[in-house]
């Protein structure tokens, strides 16, 4: 498996990001899937991008982190694609999700973004 993550994220922060995703899914707006997330990042709409680490082949998501860096969108790596799919409300695994409107998770997303910036 290719090593995509440039920084280690504490499990506590990963869990908080998944919790924020679930809240944003219910009260805001999210974009599910690599193509939809890529469009949200390119348009500058992504508030937080969640990327599954266990995607094969890794080339499918290899562009997400550099694009997020370029567009100043905070991103976090999630260990498991099934976990990411479940948190985004899908019955299947998911490679990438972008939170576009955080809804009631707004403060949570801002806090996660600040902590991620400090880790880099």
From Swiss-Prot:
GO terms for molecular function: ribonuclease P activity; rRNA binding; structural constituent of ribosome. InterPro entries: eL8/uL1-like (IPR050257), Ribosomal_eL30-like_sf (IPR029064), Ribosomal_eL8-like_CS (IPR004037), Ribosomal_eL8/eL30/eS12/Gad45 (IPR004038), Ribosomal_eL8/Nhp2 (IPR018492), Ribosomal_eL8_arc (IPR022481). GO terms for biological process: ribosome biogenesis; translation; tRNA 5'-leader removal. The keyword Zinc does not apply. The keyword RNA-binding applies. Keywords: Cytoplasm, Ribonucleoprotein, Ribosomal protein, RNA-binding, rRNA-binding, tRNA processing. Multifunctional RNA-binding protein that recognizes the K-turn motif in ribosomal RNA, the RNA component of RNase P, box H/ACA, box C/D and box C'/D' sRNAs. Part of the 50S ribosomal subunit. Probably part of the RNase P complex. This is Large ribosomal subunit protein eL8.
